[in-house]
Amino acid sequence: MSNVKHSKLLILGSGPAGYTAAVYAARANLKPVLVTGMQQGGQLTTTTEVENWPGDAEGLTGPALMERMKEHAERFDTEIVFDHINSVDLSSRPFRLTGDSQEYTCDALIISTGASAKYLGLESEEAFKGRGVSACATCDGFFYRNQKVAVVGGGNTAVEEALYLSNIASEVHLVHRRDSFRSEKILIDRLMDKVANGNIVLHTHRTLDEVLGDEMGVTGVRLKDTQSDMTENLDVMGVFIAIGHQPNSQIFEGQLEMKNGYIVVKSGLEGNATQTSIEGVFAAGDVMDHNYRQAITSAGTGCMAALDAERYLDSQGK
C-alpha cells in the first residue's frame, strides 16, 4: 500500500454531515476528498421515508435524499472515494490515515462517521428493519399514527421515544427487562402519568424474544418473562428499539478527547464549535452529538465544520 493520497481537507463519512461539509468546503475551493466509509449514505439509507426535511413537503426516501446530497457534493468537484478507514495517526502533520484500499494524508480532517443504533441481535429484528423495526421514533413514528407500537428499552432514550410516540400511536407498549427505569425523574413522572391517564402500557420483567410479521411487515412481538420464562404475543405494527447508540469513533480512541465514545468539540465562542482536542481536526454529526441525532442537525454541524476547517487552513497558509 505505497500509494498515498494527499488532500488539503479530508472528510470521513457520507451521511448528511459529511456531504454538507463537502459542499461548503468545495465551494471554498478546498478541493475536499470524502471517504464514504462502509455504510454509504449513513443511517438515512435505512429510513424508508423522510418527511421532516425542510423544503421537501411531499417527503422522500432516505436513500433518495442521500443520493441528492452526493450529487450536490460532486457538482462542486468533491472527490468521493469508496473506502473504509481502519487506522489513523493524528500525532504529526500532515495527519495520516490508512484505509482498506490506500493511505491518505491531509492538512485538516473532518470526522463525520456518525453513530450506529444498538440492536438486540435477533434474526427477526434484522429481517424487519425498515419494515416495522426502527431505532428512531422521530424519524419513523409518523407512519404509525393511530396504530399500536412497542418500544424496547429502559433508559432515557426508551422513555423519550415512548412519550413521543404516545402522541402519535393509539397505544404504546414499553418493554423493559427490569421493573425500574434508568431514566431522569422528570421523564419517569411524565411516563407514569401517561401510564395512569394515557395510552402507554408497561411490560416490565419482559424481553423481546421475537419480532413477528409477514411479507407486508411487522404484525407483532413475542415477549418473554424474565422471571418465569413464559412467553406472550402482542399485536403491534411497529417496534422501536431504544437501547442507545454507539458512536463510530473507535479508531480515534486514545488520540481525541471523548465522552462516552462521543468526540468532544469546543464551545464555539471563538468560531470553532466543531474543533476537537487536536487543532485542525473537526467533528460533525452524530459522532459528536448524542442529543439531537437528526439529519438536519447533522447537516448543520457539517456546514460548521467546513467553515471551521476553512478558517483553520487559511490561518496555516494552506
Curated annotation (Swiss-Prot):
The cofactor remark states: Binds 1 FAD per subunit.
Q: Which EC number(s) are documented for this chain?
A: 1.8.1.9
* Gene Ontology molecular function: any one: thioredoxin-disulfide reductase (NADPH) activity
* One Gene Ontology term from the biological process aspect of the record: cell redox homeostasis
**What InterPro entries does the record tag this protein with?**
FAD/NAD-bd_sf, FAD/NAD-binding_dom, Ferredoxin-NADP_redctase_2, Pyr_nucl-diS_OxRdtase_2_AS, Thioredox_Rdtase
Give the quaternary structure. Homodimer.
Q: What is this protein called?
A: Thioredoxin reductase
Q: Which organism is it from?
A: Vibrio cholerae serotype O1 (strain ATCC 39315 / El Tor Inaba N16961)
The organism's lineage is: Bacteria, Pseudomonadati, Pseudomonadota, Gammaproteobacteria, Vibrionales
Q: Which gene encodes it?
A: trxB
